[in-house]
């Protein structure tokens, strides 16, 4: 991967990208509120499980399949995968998150010459989800597929660690230890996601869905619903 591709990929994965990823806790704040997560160890275990059981089998698997579809212009496949993401968000909050981040990344793409006008128009007509928007942006970097999945997963990890720091709450050193644990597991998660066919892709995480739904009506919260 050349320097330009690497820097573009780092840009896409950066929490500074104005798409709002830092404003969601994906059920973690509700887990804290219900005393399921109260310590550094519990936060680390929670996020490692979420990486393994949720992100790997859903978003990372979709990303692995949608990047080649963008690169070869397979509009039917792109539409199918985008619809799958929408259908498998099990709470209003989780669906609103992927739609808002997808729209925000679409607007970012409109202002950068990283995708063609035809690709952007196709995405805009799909009620874009974040994984499909990221796949389009990442495919334009010409970075290898595996590296794009690594960047996506690490960007997710950074946002979720910040959510843990604010909601548990934890110190910065504790957050860095959790991030280190997540970073150690991300390569294996990505390699697994790359092997998943359509019938093995899933987003069945009932407790995460329940907590996300509870967070929608939680009395006091830091993160967006």
UniProtKB/Swiss-Prot annotation:
One of its GO terms (molecular function) is nickel cation binding. It is found in: Cytoplasm. InterPro entries: UreF, UreF_sf. It comes from the Bacteria. Keywords: Chaperone, Cytoplasm, Nickel insertion. The keyword Cell cycle does not apply. Its main location: cytoplasm. It holds the Pfam family UreF. The keyword Nucleotidyltransferase does not apply. GO terms for cellular component: cytoplasm. Belongs to the UreF family. UreD, UreF and UreG form a complex that acts as a GTP-hydrolysis-dependent molecular chaperone, activating the urease apoprotein by helping to assemble the nickel containing metallocenter of UreC. The UreE protein probably delivers the nickel. PANTHER family: UREASE ACCESSORY PROTEIN F (PTHR33620:SF1). Required for maturation of urease via the functional incorporation of the urease nickel metallocenter. This is Urease accessory protein UreF. The gene is ureF.
């Amino acid at each position: 991967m050349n320097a330009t591709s690497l820097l573009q990929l780092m840009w896409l994965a950066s929490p500074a990208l104005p798409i709002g990823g830092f404003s969601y806790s994906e059920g973690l704040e509700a887990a804290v509120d219900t005393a399921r997560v109260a310590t550094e160890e519990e936060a680390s275990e929670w996020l490692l499980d979420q990486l393994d059981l949720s992100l790997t089998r859903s978003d990372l698997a979709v990303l692995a399949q949608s990047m080649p579809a963008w690169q070869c212009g397979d509009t039917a496949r792109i539409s199918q995968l985008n619809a799958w993401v929408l259908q498998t968000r099990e709470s209003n909050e989780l669906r609103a998150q992927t739609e808002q981040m997808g729209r925000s990344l679409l607007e970012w793409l409109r202002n950068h010459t990283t995708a063609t006008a035809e690709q952007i128009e196709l995405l805009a007509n799909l009620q874009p989800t974040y994984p499909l928007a990221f796949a389009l942006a990442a495919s334009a970097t010409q970075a290898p597929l595996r590296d794009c999945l690594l960047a996506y997963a690490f960007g997710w990890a950074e946002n979720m660690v910040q959510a843990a720091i604010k909601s548990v709450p934890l110190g910065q050193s504790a957050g860095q230890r959790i991030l280190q644990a997540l970073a150690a597991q991300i390569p294996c998660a990505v390699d697994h996601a790359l092997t998943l066919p359509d019938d093995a892709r899933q987003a069945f995480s009932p407790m995460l869905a329940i907590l996300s739904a509870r967070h929608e009506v939680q009395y006091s919260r830091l993160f967006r619903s």
